[in-house]
Amino acid sequence: MALFSKQNKEVFTNPLNLDHPILGQVLGICSALAVTAQLKPAIVMGLAVTVITAFANVIISVIRNTIPNRIRIVVQLVVVAALVTIVSQILKAFAYDVSVQLSVYVGLIITNCILMGRLEAFAMMNKPWPSFLDGVGNGLGYAMILVIVGAAREFFGRGSLLGFQILPQGFYNLGYVNNGMMTMPAMALILVGCVIWVHRAYFYKEK
């Protein structure tokens, strides 16, 4: 099968639209709500999940025929835990402030429903390259929602993006006030719900 055959393209693109892990399958909601108060940690978390999902898929796909069925979940968890540890150490070394913001949520990637679901449903049944594409697609789909929600919450809640002030002081002089509710966890849930609503209204409008 060609590297970029029609089937492989669908494997990559499906998680970005109709079969989106958060919008379509409603997986990974907890971390999506927890790390989106600001855009920067949302981007880092999204990239971390993408990298870990992609490489965990590849590793499990390579060794899938040697894994005893009774311990396959344990093996998957060990592989993911090893990758999460590596990513966590890299973040602490090169982006310490972000790693502090993300706190325990990087470690909780180990139990992320999206990741474990792709390992069990796809990587265990497919070759390494399609598994890699599936991991990247699902990771990017997850990251996309984190970026949308994180950007909206930071912009309307703080008037900034990536820590840089976006709204000019003139707005505040005219009486504009940042929406403090956007910094509350409940708003993340509401925003994710709105995005899910728009997604389903678009893709399921014929039904």
Language model regions located:
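C-terminal transmembrane helix-loop-helix hairpin of multi-pass membrane proteins
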Residues: 10, 130-207
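Hydrophobic core segments of alpha-helical transmembrane domains in multi-pass membrane transport
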Residues: 29-33, 49-54, 81-88, 110-114, ...
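Cytoplasmic-side transmembrane-helix entry/capping segments in multi-pass membrane proteins
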Residues: 67-80, 101-107, 134
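C-terminal ends of transmembrane helices
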Residues: 56-69, 116-126, 200
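Structural signature of hydrophobic alpha-helical transmembrane segments
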Residues: 39-55, 75, 99-110, 186
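Transmembrane alpha-helix boundary signature
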Residues: 86-101
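Short amphipathic alpha-helical coupling elements at transmembrane boundaries
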Residues: 14, 61-65, 69, 130-138
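N-terminal membrane topogenic signal
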Residues: 12-23
